[in-house]
Regions:
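Solvent-exposed, flexible loop/coil residues
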Residues: 6, 209, 227
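Conserved C-terminal alpha-helix-loop-beta "cap" of PLP-dependent enzymes
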Residues: 45-204, 211-225
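Active-site C-terminal subdomain of aminotransferase-like
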Residues: 1-71
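Generic C-terminal helix-cap and adjacent flexible tail
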Residues: 133, 237-238
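Terminal helix/beta-alpha structural elements that buttress the NAD(P)+-binding lobe
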Residues: 226-237
Length: 238
């Protein structure tokens, strides 16, 4: 929180205590945290079907677990990020930061204990083992999530958001996602978290984005931003 018109005195006191603790013991705290985190990351590299992801430049405190090309043991259907998110929460009482089509993001901090990280690691291995029992390793077997792209393509900007709002007077209508391709949006569309828009007012909706949104809906994700579920408001004559 950088600024607020309604400051929380509990939060402010907590921030003061955090500053004091880091000033007095910061080096010690982060040294211990780094050891725990490095150990956890090394152990998670042993997952067989789920994978701990990393890039050239990454924040090591965030554990990104990919479930791409895995299937659920009971249904033989694709096992997606939302299912891993719900599994961790409902069965293991572990709260992930967010879920997407292919992955979940798990936040860690110096406040996490060795016992807490051990709970997480054990839960992930237990889930992975269940998948393993029903999913033998096969190099030629691809189980991609149809319609989901890890990076969304940019839409064609037709109007600015302000101009799109001004165009409302010329007529609007609501269409189902199946009929949205090529139409100019008047609403934001996004998944939360992370809250990054898939569609912005004034953009022409692409076929790939429609496919992506329908795939997310099929996996049980809530599409935010639109007034009516399963529909989006568009310009009537565009």
């Amino acid at each position: 929180m950088l600024q607020s018109s309604s400051p929380s005195y509990v939060l402010m006191a907590g921030m003061d205590e955090c500053i004091r603790m880091l000033k007095e013991r910061g080096e010690e705290i982060f040294a211990e945290y780094t050891i725990l985190l490095d150990s956890a990351r090394k152990r998670l590299q042993g997952l067989r079907h789920m994978k701990l992801m990393r890039t050239k430049r990454y924040d090591p405190s965030k554990l990104v677990i990919s479930v791409k090309n895995t299937v659920a043991s009971d249904s033989k259907k694709t096992f997606n990020g939302r299912e891993l998110y719900r599994n961790l929460l409902d069965k293991y009482h572990l709260q992930a930061e967010m879920a997407a089509g292919y992955y979940v993001v798990l936040m860690t901090s110096p406040a996490d204990s060795a016992e807490g990280l051990e709970r997480l690691i054990s839960a992930l291995y237990e889930i992975d083992q269940k998948l393993e029992e029903f999913l033998p390793v096969s190099d030629g077997d691809s189980r991609d999530i149809s319609g989901i792209q890890e990076v969304s393509e940019a839409q064609e900007p037709v109007y600015s958001s302000y101009e799109a709002e001004e165009k409302r007077g010329e007529g609007t209508e609501r269409v189902r996602w199946a009929d949205a391709e090529g139409r100019v949006s008047l609403e934001y569309t996004y998944l939360y978290p992370p809250g990054i828009p898939l569609i912005v007012p004034g953009e022409r909706i692409s076929a790939q984005t429609v496919k992506q949104i329908k795939a997310y809906e099929g996996m049980g994700f809530d599409i935010e931003g639109t007034e009516q579920k399963g529909q989006i408001e568009v310009l009537a004559h565009e």
